[in-house]
């Protein structure tokens, strides 16, 4: 009871909210629940591979991508409820992001939460991922003015360089002591697949011959025995599952040289497992771990140990991409952002408009010294039926879909603050004109409210313009293969102009413009009906009705094959793509539920090149 003059008034006693340690425990419990489900997904993948349930594998891959955001929302809701009425919230009862400024007490509280969280990670096996989860939850509570290292893990607090699982993350075999053939048999058998092998001793012999053959070509003359006394085979302890394949990933150490390798496992039509291919060298593994493919399902107690191992095999590939390819996309985003901030600190060039033909949907810019592009959805889109929500749905569709090595993955960010001084004047002017709703200029900072970030590639139209005849031939064949493989995976690109495709470092053609993609099963591929008379044929307007999803492949040549060199190469390899019959047959196969395999390696890497598995059909 409070006395104020002669007036008595009753004030409620302050509600004691949770202590910072309680909040830290709540967030860590949310992460631990997420990671337990993440690991269970990888364990389920092993069962699905053993049973040959490829549709189940596809569903699992899609569902797992959404696990993280579900757990973050769940944890933020629990935290919001726990903080209701506490001093950690603003005076009006809203969460702390209701206004930009925290009180002195709130500032101290949230800084203490981070400090307590660090203490909880001392013996944790996934500390870097837990820090990222903490950031995700905190960003739903705090205003962006507090998105810095006092409140978030902008820099990591726990070192993971020498962190490993209770059971070491990789196993070691010594082929000189027990023989290469026996070592390979034991290496494969130790994964404990609950499904019979077609002929493991035979496959191990083929694998040994392929390995020795490739080693012989790489060893210098007079190098001594092919397998020296230091020879070791080191393999990660979990299989890497994706689509219809499983992969053993490791390294061979011989005569002081490290040889990265992967062994592909496949089920044959009889349901038995075969060793299908040996991938040897960084380029082969780079293709396997490409940003254009679906994420692996891998059971990892300590992801940092797995990533450190992979980084030794793929030194050109950033750890951000490795975490992403293991299905830990948010950790990949965190590392990418840290790398990006580090690069900004140690560079001076300016963000500028990306080279190439301007698109109708996206405003694209780049930093010349950094191998990525930044894509913002325009405020006004000059395409019928296209808006922000539609474009974002298309990009999410690609994220959830099997990209079959032909669609670039993207990182999606919001509330990205960049130094205004690093923007070229013409870029800043273009952003103000085309995407004013997505930028906020605040003093010396430009805040981008929503952006997609992709690997930068050479646009195919620019590549073809300057390519020699042999390189053009390869690129055009790759372009047609990309269209075929996308269609077989139930993706119709929509706009197939060359400017919407890029060429990777290894010469692979990849699609990267997603605003017009649709499922093949939604399309109607038609032949152009005969003209009723000569005037109709000469008219600029079609003489036949055209539905919203009608496609006439006979028209493709008019838009795509104006360059005689490109036309000749295309007709040599892909003339059937200019007729509706191929598209109709492909659509029918997809509608039947057939799952076709796209090997992330060339035929010459296969141990049984004559035994390509047939397409699978739904049960």
Swiss-Prot record:
GO annotation terms (biological process): glucose metabolic process; glyoxylate cycle; tricarboxylic acid cycle
Top-level division of the source organism's lineage: Bacteria
InterPro entries named in the record: AceK_kinase (IPR046855), AceK_regulatory (IPR046854), Isocitrate_DH_AceK (IPR010452)
Active site per database record: 409
GO cellular component: cytoplasm
UniProt keyword annotations, A-Z: ATP-binding, Cytoplasm, Glyoxylate bypass, Hydrolase, Kinase, Nucleotide-binding, Protein phosphatase, Serine/threonine-protein kinase, Transferase, Tricarboxylic acid cycle
PANTHER family: ISOCITRATE DEHYDROGENASE KINASE_PHOSPHATASE, PTHR39559
Functional description taken from the UniProt entry: Bifunctional enzyme which can phosphorylate or dephosphorylate isocitrate dehydrogenase (IDH) on a specific serine residue. This is a regulatory mechanism which enables bacteria to bypass the Krebs cycle via the glyoxylate shunt in response to the source of carbon. When bacteria are grown on glucose, IDH is fully active and unphosphorylated, but when grown on acetate or ethanol, the activity of IDH declines drastically concomitant with its phosphorylation.
Protein name in UniProt: Isocitrate dehydrogenase kinase/phosphatase
